[in-house]
């Protein structure tokens, strides 16, 4: 149905091209551009309020791809990195290394299936 918007709260920074993922209880925002940052922040979905610091990503970048289930969040690619990070959504802390993409590039996208994930990059 159509309706009006209302203010939920504010993020810690005003970067663009932030990667987003979620569980049923938390929304996670990682990185961003203008300038590139490695900040990970979160909101609690069930209550209004500003974002809170979650930890740091391994690299500072924007235009990354993000995906998640109820336990883990994975963020990969973006400019200028090929790193893939992961976090445990229920626990705050810094991201851990999940591996690397074969190329460095922005505009990474994801495709999720039941038991596999594909990360695709636009390589110029």
Label each PLM-derived region with a short phrase:
Residues 1-124:
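Polar, enzyme-active/binding microenvironments
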């Amino acid at each position: 149905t159509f309706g009006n918007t209302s203010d939920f709260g504010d993020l810690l920074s005003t970067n663009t091209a932030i990667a987003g993922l979620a569980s049923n209880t938390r929304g996670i925002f990682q990185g961003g551009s203008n300038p590139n940052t490695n900040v990970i922040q979160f909101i609690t979905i069930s209550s209004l309020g500003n974002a809170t610091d979650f930890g740091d990503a391994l690299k500072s970048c924007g235009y990354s791809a993000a995906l998640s289930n109820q336990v883990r969040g994975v963020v990969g690619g973006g400019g200028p990195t090929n790193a893939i990070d992961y976090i445990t959504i229920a626990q705050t802390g810094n991201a851990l290394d999940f591996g690397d993409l074969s190329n460095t590039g922005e505009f990474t996208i994801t495709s999720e299936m039941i038991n596999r994930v594909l990360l695709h990059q636009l390589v110029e």
